[in-house]
Amino acid sequence: MKLVFYGAGNMAQAIFTGIINSSNLDANDIYLTNKSNEQALKAFAEKLGVNYSYDDATLLKDADYVFLGTKPHDFDALATRIKPHITKDNCFISIMAGIPIDYIKQQLECQNPVARIMPNTNAQVGHSVTGISFSNNFDPKSKDEINDLVKAFGSVIEVSEDHLHQVTAITGSGPAFLYHVFEQYVKAGTKLGLEKEQVEESIRNLIIGTSKMIERSDLSMAQLRKNITSKGGTTQAGLDTLSQYDLVSIFEDCLNAAVDRSIELSNVEDQ
């Protein structure tokens, strides 16, 4: 299986590092390329023990899966450059935010299978939650192979392309939303009189420990919460205060804003 990665930004690096480290692929069958920074590309390719090239004919020849990881505003130029070299065997996997499958096919001037994936930055530690959507001309074998590739850097949820907007909001942007909540928790904890460094370290470990509890337990998060909430205790007092605020509406507004922006970005013809 030959893989080609167009684009070597942070997300692309997280993805193909996960794939390389977690698969049985031969490093000689993996090719990287970027827009222009050959020095950085060469160093990274050598670090991973894979190939790099700027020759599109070489890259696309016999390539099974071609990852499109360029910045969205660079895609049209990339498509113009590579479309003369596309073969019938190339399946495309886009990690570009906001660019629909139909537009990708239109710019590439081909009807090759195209999948869109929406990972998050947790791919860097092998724990992305990645939404994936396939064009309707994928065969089952190719879909299974792509799912296996994506599972190399986390878990997968397959949805219709229209629902990638919701996945983008919930899991794609999710880490940033949670970081923001944790920031506020640190600020509030610091106001209780502890040193900021103490609070930050405590909450960092609190997050790690709580995540492991969720991971290792078969119980729902609601039940896990109930298990540590004693009637009349300190936890109950804090939860009673939280319940006075409409947290659901706050998060609904947050997610809806992200969904709306994702839809706006997908209207590439209007940009």
Curated annotation (Swiss-Prot):
Organism placement in taxonomy: Bacteria, Bacillati, Bacillota, Bacilli, Bacillales
Species in which this protein is naturally found: Staphylococcus aureus (strain MSSA476)
Entry's family note: Belongs to the pyrroline-5-carboxylate reductase family.
Name the UniProt record assigns to this protein: Pyrroline-5-carboxylate reductase
SUPFAM superfamilies, alphabetized: 6-phosphogluconate dehydrogenase C-terminal domain-like, NAD(P)-binding Rossmann-fold domains
EC number: 1.5.1.2
Role this protein plays: Catalyzes the reduction of 1-pyrroline-5-carboxylate (PCA) to L-proline.
Catalysed reaction equations from the record: L-proline + NADP(+) = (S)-1-pyrroline-5-carboxylate + NADPH + 2 H(+); L-proline + NAD(+) = (S)-1-pyrroline-5-carboxylate + NADH + 2 H(+)
GO molecular function, one term: pyrroline-5-carboxylate reductase activity
Pathway: Amino-acid biosynthesis; L-proline biosynthesis; L-proline from L-glutamate 5-semialdehyde: step 1/1
